[in-house]
């Protein structure tokens, strides 16, 4: 089974070129729920690699392509949190403006994102 390589950093992110997830240490989060929510969000990104679910992940912060992948990760992490019984608030205010712009430009985007998030959810739950 392929497993993500976890690295400690102050900023969480998934690095497709090295197939690694960088996640701050637990002590840097307000509570365990936010730590797990962030880790699950990054795992959803990780699941989109060509060798896994092969999602097209492109675009820079603020672009519609980037917003789409972030929406997938946010929905996927919410699905995973629900299945795993993790209750908490996930706050990604920095993405909301780009989500709204992308959603206004494509009325079906939420359904496309939910479908991709559901696939990521199933993929990751099958690995547990």
Per-range role (PLM):
Residues 6-9, 58-63, 83-86, 105:
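Active-site-adjacent structural elements in folded domains
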């Amino acid at each position: 089974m392929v497993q993500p390589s976890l690295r400690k950093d102050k900023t969480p992110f998934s690095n497709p070129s090295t197939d690694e997830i960088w996640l701050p240490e637990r002590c840097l989060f307000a509570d365990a729920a936010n730590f797990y929510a962030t880790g699950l969000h990054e795992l959803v990104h990780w699941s989109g690699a060509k060798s896994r679910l092969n999602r097209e992940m492109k675009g820079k912060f603020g672009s519609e392509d980037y917003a789409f992948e972030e929406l997938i990760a946010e929905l996927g992490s919410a699905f995973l949190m629900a299945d795993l019984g993790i209750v908490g608030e996930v706050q990604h205010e920095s993405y909301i403006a780009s989500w709204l712009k992308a959603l206004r430009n494509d009325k079906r985007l939420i359904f496309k994102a939910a479908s991709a998030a559901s696939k990521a959810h199933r993929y990751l739950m099958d690995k547990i």
